[in-house]
Protein backbone atom coordinates (compact mmCIF):
# COMPACT_ATOMS: atom_id res chain seq x y z
CA UNK A 1 0.00 0.00 0.00
CA UNK A 2 2.81 2.34 0.89
CA UNK A 3 4.52 1.57 -2.41
CA UNK A 4 1.37 2.44 -4.37
CA UNK A 5 1.04 5.78 -2.55
CA UNK A 6 4.69 6.54 -3.25
CA UNK A 7 4.28 5.68 -6.93
CA UNK A 8 1.14 7.82 -7.14
CA UNK A 9 2.97 10.76 -5.58
CA UNK A 10 5.92 10.35 -7.95
CA UNK A 11 3.67 10.19 -11.01
CA UNK A 12 1.69 13.21 -9.82
CA UNK A 13 4.87 15.25 -9.45
CA UNK A 14 6.09 14.06 -12.86
CA UNK A 15 2.80 15.02 -14.52
CA UNK A 16 2.87 18.48 -12.93
CA UNK A 17 6.48 19.00 -13.98
CA UNK A 18 5.68 17.81 -17.51
CA UNK A 19 2.85 20.34 -17.76
CA UNK A 20 5.11 23.13 -16.53
CA UNK A 21 7.83 22.22 -19.02
CA UNK A 22 5.34 21.84 -21.88
CA UNK A 23 3.55 25.15 -21.22
CA UNK A 24 6.13 27.41 -22.97
CA UNK A 25 5.95 25.14 -26.03
CA UNK A 26 2.13 25.31 -25.95
CA UNK A 27 2.23 29.10 -25.56
CA UNK A 28 4.56 29.37 -28.55
CA UNK A 29 2.23 27.32 -30.76
CA UNK A 30 -0.88 29.13 -29.55
CA UNK A 31 0.65 32.55 -30.14
CA UNK A 32 1.77 31.44 -33.60
CA UNK A 33 -1.79 30.75 -34.81
CA UNK A 34 -3.73 33.77 -33.46
CA UNK A 35 -3.96 37.39 -34.54
CA UNK A 36 -1.90 40.01 -32.76
CA UNK A 37 -4.88 41.38 -30.81
CA UNK A 38 -5.75 38.02 -29.24
CA UNK A 39 -2.36 37.22 -27.74
CA UNK A 40 -2.81 39.08 -24.46
CA UNK A 41 -6.60 39.03 -24.40
CA UNK A 42 -8.08 38.67 -20.86
CA UNK A 43 -10.55 36.11 -22.29
CA UNK A 44 -7.82 33.70 -23.31
CA UNK A 45 -8.99 30.18 -24.15
CA UNK A 46 -6.93 27.01 -24.27
CA UNK A 47 -7.74 26.61 -27.96
CA UNK A 48 -8.09 29.81 -30.00
CA UNK A 49 -11.49 30.29 -31.70
CA UNK A 50 -9.78 30.76 -35.06
CA UNK A 51 -6.49 29.21 -36.11
CA UNK A 52 -4.54 31.43 -38.50
CA UNK A 53 -2.13 29.17 -40.35
CA UNK A 54 -1.32 32.06 -42.68
CA UNK A 55 0.87 33.41 -39.88
CA UNK A 56 3.50 30.83 -40.82
CA UNK A 57 3.48 31.98 -44.44
CA UNK A 58 3.59 35.64 -43.45
CA UNK A 59 6.44 35.00 -41.01
CA UNK A 60 8.56 33.46 -43.76
CA UNK A 61 7.84 36.20 -46.30
CA UNK A 62 8.09 39.33 -44.15
CA UNK A 63 11.79 38.51 -43.64
CA UNK A 64 14.15 36.67 -46.06
CA UNK A 65 14.12 33.50 -43.96
CA UNK A 66 15.16 31.30 -46.87
CA UNK A 67 18.48 33.17 -46.97
CA UNK A 68 18.81 33.03 -43.18
CA UNK A 69 18.14 29.28 -43.29
CA UNK A 70 20.88 28.75 -45.89
CA UNK A 71 23.36 30.83 -43.88
CA UNK A 72 22.58 29.00 -40.63
CA UNK A 73 22.68 25.58 -42.30
CA UNK A 74 26.06 26.33 -43.89
CA UNK A 75 27.56 27.48 -40.59
CA UNK A 76 26.08 24.54 -38.68
CA UNK A 77 27.13 21.80 -41.12
CA UNK A 78 30.69 23.10 -41.44
CA UNK A 79 30.94 23.37 -37.65
CA UNK A 80 29.74 19.80 -37.18
CA UNK A 81 32.34 18.51 -39.65
CA UNK A 82 35.12 20.54 -38.06
CA UNK A 83 34.21 19.67 -34.48
CA UNK A 84 33.89 15.93 -35.11
CA UNK A 85 37.18 15.82 -37.01
CA UNK A 86 39.36 17.99 -34.78
CA UNK A 87 37.93 17.03 -31.37
CA UNK A 88 38.15 13.30 -32.14
CA UNK A 89 41.80 13.69 -33.19
CA UNK A 90 42.62 15.63 -30.03
CA UNK A 91 40.75 13.14 -27.86
CA UNK A 92 42.62 10.29 -29.55
CA UNK A 93 45.92 11.91 -28.69
CA UNK A 94 44.91 12.41 -25.05
CA UNK A 95 43.48 8.91 -24.59
CA UNK A 96 45.21 6.35 -26.82
CA UNK A 97 48.68 7.81 -27.30
CA UNK A 98 51.13 7.64 -24.39
CA UNK A 99 53.52 10.57 -24.04
CA UNK A 100 55.15 12.29 -21.03
CA UNK A 101 52.86 14.65 -19.13
CA UNK A 102 49.78 13.74 -21.16
CA UNK A 103 47.30 13.78 -18.28
CA UNK A 104 48.83 16.92 -16.72
CA UNK A 105 48.56 18.82 -20.00
CA UNK A 106 44.96 17.69 -20.37
CA UNK A 107 44.20 18.80 -16.81
CA UNK A 108 45.67 22.24 -17.51
CA UNK A 109 43.58 22.54 -20.67
CA UNK A 110 40.43 21.65 -18.75
CA UNK A 111 40.90 24.70 -16.54
CA UNK A 112 39.99 26.78 -19.59
CA UNK A 113 36.44 25.42 -19.25
CA UNK A 114 36.06 27.68 -16.22
CA UNK A 115 36.50 30.77 -18.41
CA UNK A 116 33.14 32.10 -19.64
CA UNK A 117 32.78 33.11 -23.27
CA UNK A 118 32.29 36.74 -22.26
CA UNK A 119 35.90 36.85 -20.99
CA UNK A 120 37.29 35.82 -24.39
CA UNK A 121 34.73 37.66 -26.50
CA UNK A 122 36.57 40.98 -26.87
CA UNK A 123 40.06 39.49 -27.53
CA UNK A 124 38.54 37.20 -30.16
CA UNK A 125 36.79 40.09 -31.86
CA UNK A 126 39.97 42.19 -31.87
CA UNK A 127 41.87 39.33 -33.47
CA UNK A 128 39.31 38.67 -36.20
CA UNK A 129 38.94 42.40 -36.85
CA UNK A 130 42.73 42.68 -37.22
CA UNK A 131 42.59 39.93 -39.85
CA UNK A 132 39.80 41.77 -41.66
CA UNK A 133 37.38 38.84 -41.29
CA UNK A 134 34.52 40.49 -39.43
CA UNK A 135 31.19 40.42 -41.25
CA UNK A 136 32.18 37.04 -42.69
CA UNK A 137 31.39 33.48 -41.64
CA UNK A 138 35.05 32.76 -40.84
CA UNK A 139 34.89 33.63 -37.09
CA UNK A 140 31.87 31.33 -36.78
CA UNK A 141 33.40 28.36 -38.65
CA UNK A 142 37.20 28.34 -38.50
CA UNK A 143 37.55 27.76 -34.70
CA UNK A 144 35.75 24.43 -35.07
CA UNK A 145 38.73 23.07 -37.03
CA UNK A 146 41.22 23.87 -34.26
CA UNK A 147 40.28 21.55 -31.42
CA UNK A 148 36.50 21.62 -31.65
CA UNK A 149 36.03 22.80 -28.07
CA UNK A 150 37.42 21.45 -24.81
CA UNK A 151 34.10 20.03 -23.67
CA UNK A 152 33.78 17.98 -26.85
CA UNK A 153 37.36 16.76 -26.47
CA UNK A 154 36.57 15.77 -22.88
CA UNK A 155 33.48 13.80 -23.92
CA UNK A 156 35.32 11.93 -26.65
CA UNK A 157 38.36 11.27 -24.49
CA UNK A 158 36.21 9.71 -21.77
CA UNK A 159 34.56 7.50 -24.36
CA UNK A 160 37.85 6.50 -26.01
CA UNK A 161 39.30 5.52 -22.61
CA UNK A 162 36.52 2.94 -22.24
CA UNK A 163 37.61 1.15 -25.44
CA UNK A 164 39.93 -1.79 -24.59
CA UNK A 165 43.62 -1.22 -25.37
CA UNK A 166 43.81 -4.79 -26.69
CA UNK A 167 42.05 -3.65 -29.86
CA UNK A 168 44.83 -1.14 -30.55
CA UNK A 169 47.48 -3.77 -29.86
CA UNK A 170 45.83 -6.30 -32.17
CA UNK A 171 45.60 -3.75 -34.98
CA UNK A 172 49.21 -2.69 -34.37
CA UNK A 173 50.38 -6.32 -34.66
CA UNK A 174 48.52 -6.57 -37.98
CA UNK A 175 50.60 -3.66 -39.26
CA UNK A 176 48.23 -0.75 -38.69
CA UNK A 177 49.72 2.63 -37.79
CA UNK A 178 48.37 5.09 -35.26
CA UNK A 179 46.24 6.97 -37.76
CA UNK A 180 44.95 3.74 -39.26
CA UNK A 181 43.90 2.56 -35.79
CA UNK A 182 42.10 5.88 -35.30
CA UNK A 183 40.20 5.49 -38.57
CA UNK A 184 39.52 1.74 -38.56
CA UNK A 185 39.20 0.89 -34.86
CA UNK A 186 38.37 3.92 -32.72
CA UNK A 187 35.93 5.84 -34.92
CA UNK A 188 33.72 2.85 -35.88
CA UNK A 189 33.31 2.04 -32.17
CA UNK A 190 32.51 5.64 -31.24
CA UNK A 191 29.24 6.16 -33.06
CA UNK A 192 27.32 7.06 -29.89
CA UNK A 193 29.67 9.78 -28.68
CA UNK A 194 30.04 11.17 -32.20
CA UNK A 195 26.27 11.56 -32.38
CA UNK A 196 26.20 13.23 -28.96
CA UNK A 197 28.91 15.72 -29.91
CA UNK A 198 27.31 16.29 -33.30
CA UNK A 199 23.94 16.98 -31.68
CA UNK A 200 25.47 19.39 -29.16
CA UNK A 201 27.29 21.17 -31.97
CA UNK A 202 24.13 21.39 -34.04
CA UNK A 203 22.12 22.90 -31.19
CA UNK A 204 24.89 25.33 -30.20
CA UNK A 205 25.27 26.69 -33.72
CA UNK A 206 21.64 26.49 -34.81
CA UNK A 207 20.53 28.46 -31.74
CA UNK A 208 23.55 30.75 -31.45
CA UNK A 209 22.64 34.43 -31.23
CA UNK A 210 25.58 36.11 -29.51
CA UNK A 211 28.42 35.20 -31.88
CA UNK A 212 26.54 36.09 -35.11
CA UNK A 213 25.40 39.34 -33.50
CA UNK A 214 29.03 40.23 -32.72
CA UNK A 215 30.59 39.36 -36.08
CA UNK A 216 27.82 39.81 -38.68
CA UNK A 217 26.53 43.23 -39.67
CA UNK A 218 25.16 42.65 -43.18
CA UNK A 219 21.53 41.55 -43.54
CA UNK A 220 22.54 39.11 -46.28
CA UNK A 221 24.73 37.21 -43.82
CA UNK A 222 22.23 37.06 -40.95
CA UNK A 223 21.41 33.74 -39.30
CA UNK A 224 17.98 32.54 -38.19
CA UNK A 225 18.44 33.85 -34.66
CA UNK A 226 19.28 37.33 -35.92
CA UNK A 227 16.35 37.10 -38.31
CA UNK A 228 13.95 36.38 -35.45
CA UNK A 229 15.10 39.54 -33.73
CA UNK A 230 13.89 41.56 -36.73
CA UNK A 231 10.29 41.04 -35.62
CA UNK A 232 10.93 43.29 -32.61
CA UNK A 233 10.69 46.95 -33.54
CA UNK A 234 11.51 50.08 -31.59
CA UNK A 235 7.93 50.53 -30.33
CA UNK A 236 6.13 47.24 -30.96
CA UNK A 237 6.68 43.59 -31.75
CA UNK A 238 4.92 41.16 -34.10
CA UNK A 239 4.67 38.41 -31.51
CA UNK A 240 2.39 36.14 -33.50
CA UNK A 241 4.64 36.17 -36.56
CA UNK A 242 7.71 35.85 -34.39
CA UNK A 243 6.33 32.77 -32.60
CA UNK A 244 5.35 31.26 -35.95
CA UNK A 245 8.93 31.71 -37.14
CA UNK A 246 10.26 30.34 -33.84
CA UNK A 247 8.11 27.21 -34.24
CA UNK A 248 9.58 26.63 -37.70
CA UNK A 249 13.13 27.21 -36.45
CA UNK A 250 12.66 24.84 -33.49
CA UNK A 251 11.21 22.03 -35.61
CA UNK A 252 14.54 20.70 -37.03
CA UNK A 253 16.02 20.47 -33.53
CA UNK A 254 13.07 18.45 -32.25
CA UNK A 255 13.13 16.07 -35.22
CA UNK A 256 16.89 15.57 -34.97
CA UNK A 257 16.70 14.82 -31.25
CA UNK A 258 13.83 12.35 -31.69
CA UNK A 259 15.81 10.39 -34.28
CA UNK A 260 19.07 10.53 -32.30
CA UNK A 261 17.56 10.08 -28.82
CA UNK A 262 18.66 6.45 -28.43
CA UNK A 263 22.28 7.14 -29.36
CA UNK A 264 22.27 10.38 -27.36
CA UNK A 265 21.35 8.61 -24.12
CA UNK A 266 23.81 5.77 -24.78
CA UNK A 267 26.61 8.22 -25.54
CA UNK A 268 26.02 10.27 -22.40
CA UNK A 269 25.96 7.10 -20.27
CA UNK A 270 29.15 5.68 -21.77
CA UNK A 271 31.16 8.90 -21.43
CA UNK A 272 30.81 8.72 -17.66
CA UNK A 273 29.17 12.13 -17.10
CA UNK A 274 25.68 10.87 -16.35
CA UNK A 275 24.11 11.92 -13.05
Question: Across the structure, where does each feature detected by a protein language model lie?
Answer:
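A structural signal for multi-pass alpha-helical bundles of membrane permease subunits
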Residues: 2-275
Amino acid sequence: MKTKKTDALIYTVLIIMSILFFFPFYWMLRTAVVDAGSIFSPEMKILPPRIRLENFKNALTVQPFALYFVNTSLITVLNIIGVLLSSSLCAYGFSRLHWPGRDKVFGILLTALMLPYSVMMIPHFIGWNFLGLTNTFAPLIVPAYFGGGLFNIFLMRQFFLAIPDELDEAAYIDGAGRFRIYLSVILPLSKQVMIVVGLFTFLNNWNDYLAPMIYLSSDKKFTLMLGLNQFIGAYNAQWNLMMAAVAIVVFPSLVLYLFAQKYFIEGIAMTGIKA
